[in-house]
């Protein structure tokens, strides 16, 4: 075992002495050393419940014959970080988490890892570390929050009843009292936000790829099932160490394709494009951006999930969960291995009944194409991403007049002051991985568009990204970004922009000669942040079309 490096032989007397100083008895020195990477924090609801799950994981590890060691990782909530300087740090924490897991596992020669995670960037960061290390690992996602409940059976959700409600209040659609009712009921307890936002989408894809146990991706944070999954995961990691089953044997090209298909079938978060590209990069799997669009054209959307639809994670769980989605997808799902022994098709076959009011059959889809589309054009030569499951039929094709803003704050101010009108295309730039830095989520302006009733008359494009809670005609991940001299930085107020999602095109209707003249006079703006971690990050992060990963160069 890897841990023999620090536990065996007289040369390791100092190492054993330190371990004994931590309370490890001699009898445990020949047991598998299992690291439990926990992102517990009492700052955010998605991670508050992890102390309980830690206990059950530890019990499982010891029952399985291993010895558990806890170490901590940061957990950032995109909702709390939204709309201010804090959002610059969200995506970069994905890289920090991957590096921290790698550092602890290698420094202390851990034999295997249980990765306890939940919210947006923590899960992909841990999966990146698992693929990079390629030692036995299992993921436990802490589970989604229940929907909020109100009178007359009303269900509340975080994005619809906070960010969008804020704009409805500003527009005079709801009263201050109604806004407070939303605030009090939107988040009723622990767990990741209730809809198919980034955290829950990543939990589902982790299960789809076979890196977590069945139903881990959908079991509610408050459920006893989640505790049992935590215990079983602790037991399982010891078995994985004994059999040397490692992530790269699970994270194959076919497993990534299955994850993309499930993502498309559910209409998941556009952030998953960034994260799957980054995880595949660590796993040594070639996964071009175009793969998402190729699969989208042949994978129907089978569920209508919040925020764009009516169903919540609690509905998906009882309807059949991830295995139920794979069952409905049939032969579109490839038969891949999971870390718990069963193949994906065996899991799908194990589901006896699927609630087809939630997860529809292929013969009766919500939409003929999957939830994510990749666009190209002279604004996005290397690609852009749209969550087409959240776009109304009316806005699938649109032409409008550009209103340009060099930051999210400037765009948000214009929206709240009523300066954006029907027929506009809001352009938010210098918010990419380098230019932001950190590729901030534009949830506040996109939610404002919907709350102000502009979702069917105004489009938004950006080199930043969007929350999993975003809906509406919002195109992000535009590559190359403005800070790298991308064409989005050449757009001027009054230019006409054409959006054609069915044709996968995003075009600036300006003569090429005019664009070349603008490019000749373009000057890169100074960095927005010139010191600290983000300044270093901006120098080494790649473009969105490659997953916004950091490089050694």
Curated annotation (Swiss-Prot):
UniProt cofactor note: Binds 1 [2Fe-2S] cluster per subunit. This cluster acts as a Lewis acid cofactor.
Report the protein name in the record: Dihydroxy-acid dehydratase
What InterPro entries does the entry give?
Answer: Dihydro-acid_dehy_C, DihydroxyA_deHydtase, DiOHA_6PGluconate_deHydtase_CS, ILV_EDD_C, ILV_EDD_N, IlvD/EDD_N
Gene of this entry: ilvD
Which pathway is it part of?
A: Amino-acid biosynthesis; L-isoleucine biosynthesis; L-isoleucine from 2-oxobutanoate: step 3/4; Amino-acid biosynthesis; L-valine biosynthesis; L-valine from pyruvate: step 3/4
Binding-site residues for Mg(2+), renumbered to this chain: 78, 120-121, 441
Which leading EC class covers this enzyme? lyase
Residue positions of the PTM N6-carboxylysine?
A: 121
Q: What are the protein's UniProt keywords?
A: 2Fe-2S, Amino-acid biosynthesis, Branched-chain amino acid biosynthesis, Iron, Iron-sulfur, Lyase, Magnesium, Metal-binding
Family, according to the entry, reads as follows: Belongs to the IlvD/Edd family.
**What Pfam families does the annotation carry?**
ILV_EDD_C (PF24877), ILVD_EDD_N (PF00920)
């Amino acid at each position: 075992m890897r841990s023999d490096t620090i536990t065996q032989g007289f040369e390791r007397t100092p190492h054993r002495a330190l371990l004994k100083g931590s309370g490890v008895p001699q009898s445990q020195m020949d047991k598998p050393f299992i690291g439990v990477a926990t992102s517990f924090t009492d700052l955010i609801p998605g991670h508050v419940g992890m102390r309980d799950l830690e206990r059950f994981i530890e019990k499982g590890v010891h029952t399985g014959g291993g010895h558990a060691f806890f170490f901590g990782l940061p957990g950032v909530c995109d909702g709390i970080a939204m709309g201010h300087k804090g959002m610059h740090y969200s995506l970069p924490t994905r890289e920090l988490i991957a590096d921290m897991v790698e550092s602890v596992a290698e420094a202390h020669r851990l034999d295997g890892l249980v990765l306890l995670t939940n919210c947006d960037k923590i899960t992909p960061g841990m999966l990146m570390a698992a693929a990079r290390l390629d030692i036995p690992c299992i993921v436990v996602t802490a589970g989604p929050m229940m929907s909020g409940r109100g009178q007359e059976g009303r269900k509340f959700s975080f994005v619809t009843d906070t960010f969008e409600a804020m704009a409805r209040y500003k527009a005079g659609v709801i009263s201050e009292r109604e806004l407070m009712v939303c605030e009090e009921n939107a988040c009723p307890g622990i767990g990741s936000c209730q809809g198919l936002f980034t955290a829950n989408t990543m939990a589902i894809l982790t299960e789809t790829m076979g890196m977590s146990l069945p139903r881990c991706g959908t079991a509610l944070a408050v459920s006893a099932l989640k505790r049992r999954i935590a215990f079983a995961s602790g037991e399982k990691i010891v078995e994985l160490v004994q059999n040397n089953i490692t992530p790269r044997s699970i994270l194959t090209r076919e497993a990534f394709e299955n994850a993309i298909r499930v993502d498309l079938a559910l209409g998941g978060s556009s952030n998953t494009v960034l994260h799957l590209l980054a995880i595949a990069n660590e796993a040594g799997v070639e996964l071009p951006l175009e793969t998402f669009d190729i699969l989208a054209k042949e994978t129907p959307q089978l569920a209508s999930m919040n925020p764009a639809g009516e169903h919540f994670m609690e509905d998906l769980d009882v309807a059949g969960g991830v295995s139920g989605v794979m069952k409905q997808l049939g032969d579109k799902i490839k038969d891949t291995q999971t870390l718990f022994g069963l193949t994906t098709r065996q899991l799908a076959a194990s589901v006896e009944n699927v609630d087809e009011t939630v997860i529809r059959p292929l013969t009766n889809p919500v939409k003929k194409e999957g939830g994510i589309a990749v666009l190209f054009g002279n604004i996005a030569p290397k690609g852009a991403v749209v969550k087409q499951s959240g776009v109304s039929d009316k806005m699938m094709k649109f032409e409008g007049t550009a209103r340009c803003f060099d930051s999210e704050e400037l765009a948000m101010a214009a929206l709240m002051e009523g300066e954006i009108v029907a027929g506009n295309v809001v352009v938010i730039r210098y918010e990419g991985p380098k230019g932001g830095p950190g590729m901030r989520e534009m949830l506040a302006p996109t939610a404002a568009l919907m709350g102000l009733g502009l979702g069917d008359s105004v489009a938004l494009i950006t080199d930043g990204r969007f929350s999993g809670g975003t809906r509406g005609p919002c195109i992000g991940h535009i590559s190359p970004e403005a800070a790298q001299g991308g064409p989005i930085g050449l757009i001027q107020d009054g230019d006409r922009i054409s959006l054609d999602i069915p044709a996968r095109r995003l075009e600036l209707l300006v003569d090429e000669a005019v664009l070349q003249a603008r490019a000749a006079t373009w000057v890169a703006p100074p960095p927005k942040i010139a010191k600290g971690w983000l300044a270093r990050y901006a120098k080494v992060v790649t473009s969105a079309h490659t997953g916004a990963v950091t490089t050694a160069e």
